[in-house]
């Protein structure tokens, strides 16, 4: 069953039963109590203890404390799987909050009080050569213009909601919008239909769904749905049991991620 250089993407494509086999092989404790993403990260962590491995995450920089940062591989949020990134690496490649950074990672040194993983070598920033990151523009310096490219949302003949948007409230790339509706009016279903339209009609676009102050079961439902329509789509969340500071932090990280995509000329 052993496979070298497993990545989080590799494991997320496998069934939970298959990941259990890796967990048993690496002798991971209490693996049956973990969800799929937590277990996948635990397998990668166990693999790292045997050899260097490649991992990626969303960068959060602490400018007020020396300029170092952490890669957040799990839900844009702090976790024990975070990867330390030195200030010198951040400065060398001109990295910013919200960048997706990938590279070779080393496990914590034995006997050290530091239990964090460390980035040894950066080989990709937002999926491209890291040297390209230094020459990109800054989001505040970009010129705002009116949308000039329509985003078609209709994707299912049986669904009239997205068809009505296209007819009466058309949406363009770069446009902001708001859904105003009372509770239990079907906003979640509406968002699902919009996500399906983006995934079908704008395949090169990056789909990120942000859920704030929602129930955990709503998060699970959206995660399952988004993964079924768009393998590269993301669901980022801060559920109602989290502190308000968590809601703000997650929202800011997703906004930073969106700005980095725009700087990279991605939709």
Regions found by a protein language model. Give the residues of each.
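Basic helix-extension-helix modules of the SAP/HeH family
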Residues: 1-51
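Residue-level signature of catalytic and energy-coupling elements of molecular machines
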Residues: 19, 39, 69, 86, ...
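Phosphate-binding/switch loop-helix module in NTP-utilizing enzymes
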Residues: 246-267
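Phosphate-binding glycine-rich loops and their immediate beta-loop-alpha structural context
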Residues: 144-146, 150-251
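Conserved phosphate/pyrophosphate-binding and hydrolysis machinery centered on Walker-type P-loop NTPases
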Residues: 5, 9-13, 29-37, 111-116, ...
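Phosphate-binding P-loop/Walker A region and its immediate neighborhood
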Residues: 105-110, 120-163
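Phosphate-interacting basic helix/loop segments used at nucleotide- and nucleic-acid interfaces
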Residues: 53-55, 160-164, 254-259
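N-terminal "pre-motor" subdomain/linker immediately upstream of P-loop NTPase catalytic cores
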Residues: 32, 37-133
């Amino acid at each position: 069953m052993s496979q070298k250089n497993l990545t989080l993407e590799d494991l997320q494509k496998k069934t939970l039963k298959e990941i259990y086999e890796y967990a048993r092989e690496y002798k991971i404790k209490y693996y049956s109590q973990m969800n799929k993403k937590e277990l996948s990260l635990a397998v990668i962590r166990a693999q790292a203890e045997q050899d260097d491995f490649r991992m990626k995450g969303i960068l959060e920089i602490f400018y007020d404390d020396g300029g170092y940062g952490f890669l957040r591989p799990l839900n844009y949020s702090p976790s024990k799987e975070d990867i330390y990134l030195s200030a010198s690496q951040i400065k060398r490649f001109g990295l910013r909050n919200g960048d997706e950074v990938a590279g070779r990672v080393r496990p914590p040194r034995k006997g050290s009080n530091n239990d964090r993983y460390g980035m040894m070598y950066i080989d990709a920033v937002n999926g491209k050569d890291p040297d390209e990151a230094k020459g990109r523009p800054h989001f505040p310096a970009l010129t705002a213009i009116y949308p000039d490219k329509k985003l078609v949302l209709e994707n299912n003949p049986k669904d009239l909601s997205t068809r009505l948007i296209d007819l009466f409230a058309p949406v363009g790339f770069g446009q902001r919008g708001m859904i105003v509706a009372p509770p239990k009016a079907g906003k979640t279903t509406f968002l699902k239909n919009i996500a399906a339209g983006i995934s079908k009609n704008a395949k090169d676009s990056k789909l990120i769904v942000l859920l704030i102050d929602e129930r955990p079961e709503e998060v699970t439902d959206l995660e399952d749905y988004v993964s079924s329509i768009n393998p590269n789509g993301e669901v980022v969340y801060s559920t109602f049991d989290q502190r308000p500071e968590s809601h703000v932090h997650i929202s800011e990280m997703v906004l930073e991620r969106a700005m980095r995509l725009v700087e990279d000329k991605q939709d």
